[in-house]
């Protein structure tokens, strides 16, 4: 359905993280952190997410992009949602499209993405649904493998322990982009980043480079918390955990 067989590694970043590999990967197993960690409390940033658990070792979340924040006192218009989505693309992309009467911002933005990526890769993506195009769809396969098979968020994660220090780990981040059936392109050499290096050094990550900085900047503090906390275990929330 996602045609994973016809993907190629376009970007590969390997970063050393100042936290145990298991704790590092748990940071990417839920979407509840998005509102504060990634969005600074901005409107429309509440993650509308469903979680599924499959036996024996697979789970999935689907975070719908461009959905209404259920905690907002009043629902935004589709045009307001469209402006929020368009803001991701930057000023160089031109004026924000108008959402026609009866249409949704999600559907309009998905068509923009399919057209843009179709021109970039010289391929037809019209068969992709709005959800397949826009949404953050993550499958986790125990113990350390994640894949996002969507069109605009095409990531693969792998987390590995540091063999010399259990308080550090390695995070391999890949972007899998579409390729024509039968084509063969060698994968790029990984860009290796140390703990204090920014993901924005990788041009291939685009605007997501800054997002990954936000996702991992608090991990050293997490390790310190593990070492100093008097509790014997974790405290889990009753929502999205």
List each language-model region with its residue ranges:
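C-terminal catalytic domain of Rieske-type non-heme iron oxygenases
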Residues: 1-241
């Amino acid at each position: 359905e996602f045609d994973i067989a016809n993907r190629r590694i376009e970007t590969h970043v390997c970063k050393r993280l100042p936290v145990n590999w298991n704790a590092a990967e748990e940071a990417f197993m839920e979407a509840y952190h998005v509102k504060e960690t990634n969005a600074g409390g901005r409107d429309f940033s509440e993650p509308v997410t469903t979680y599924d658990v499959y036996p024996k070792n697979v789970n999935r979340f689907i975070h719908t992009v461009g959905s209404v924040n259920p905690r907002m006192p009043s629902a935004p218009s589709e045009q307001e949602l469209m402006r929020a989505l368009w803001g991701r693309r930057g000023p160089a992309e031109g004026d924000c499209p108008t959402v026609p009467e009866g249409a949704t911002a999600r559907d309009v933005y998905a068509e923009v993405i399919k057209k843009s990526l179709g021109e970039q890769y010289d391929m037809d993506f019209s068969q992709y649904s709005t959800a397949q195009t826009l949404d953050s769809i993550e499958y986790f396969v125990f113990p350390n493998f994640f894949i996002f098979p969507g069109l605009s968020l095409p990531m693969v994660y792998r987390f590995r322990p540091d063999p010399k220090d259990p308080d550090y780990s390695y995070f391999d981040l890949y972007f899998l982009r579409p390729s024509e059936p039968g084509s063969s392109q060698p994968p790029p050499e990984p860009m290796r980043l140390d703990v204090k290096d920014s993901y924005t050094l990788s041009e291939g990550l685009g605007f997501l480079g800054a997002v990954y900085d936000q996702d991992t900047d608090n991990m050293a503090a997490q390790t310190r918390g593990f070492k100093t906390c008097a509790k014997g275990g974790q405290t889990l929330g009753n929502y999205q955990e």
